[in-house]
A protein has these predicted regions:
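Extended, small-residue-rich solenoid/repeat segments and analogous flexible loops
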Residues: 1-25, 29
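Flexible, glycine/small-residue-enriched loop-and-beta-strand segment within the central core
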Residues: 23-32, 37-128
Length: 128
């Protein structure tokens, strides 16, 4: 599996672990540092839904991502080194538009908001 990850991700660091099942979209746009741990049933995505040519999702060295995390980049999300997230954390640089109340949210465009950068050593608690 490690060889598959090294070939599929933009970068996949040494001693990193991903626990399955996991949903991943846009692997070629995702960089995972050394000694990263991604727990059960997390969702990683780096896809150009808002028009960005090469969206970026970076997870820094020594970071641990908890169970059921959802990390979605349409332009740029960078998670620093030695970051710890609890379970059920949502991190995204985009949101669902709700500009026309006569149209269901699911039928409206994805809206790009600011890039996200989580600093080194950050702790993000559960259900954030």
């Amino acid at each position: 599996m490690r060889v598959f990850f090294k070939l599929s991700f933009k970068e996949y660091g040494k001693n990193s672990s991903i626990i399955f099942p996991l949903n991943i979209q846009g692997m070629k746009n995702i960089s995972i540092g050394d000694n990263v741990y991604i727990a059960y049933k997390s969702y990683l995505a780096s896809v150009p839904l808002t028009g960005a040519e090469n969206p970026i999702l970076e997870i820094g060295d020594g970071t641990t991502i908890g169970n059921f995390n959802h990390i979605f980049a349409t332009e740029k999300v960078v998670i620093g080194k030695k970051v710890l997230t609890a379970d059920k954390v949502y991190i995204s640089d985009n949101l669902h538009s709700y500009e026309d109340v006569t149209i269901p949210i699911i039928d409206q465009k994805i809206k790009q908001i600011n890039h996200v950068e989580i600093g080194d050593g950050t702790w993000i608690g559960e259900n954030v």
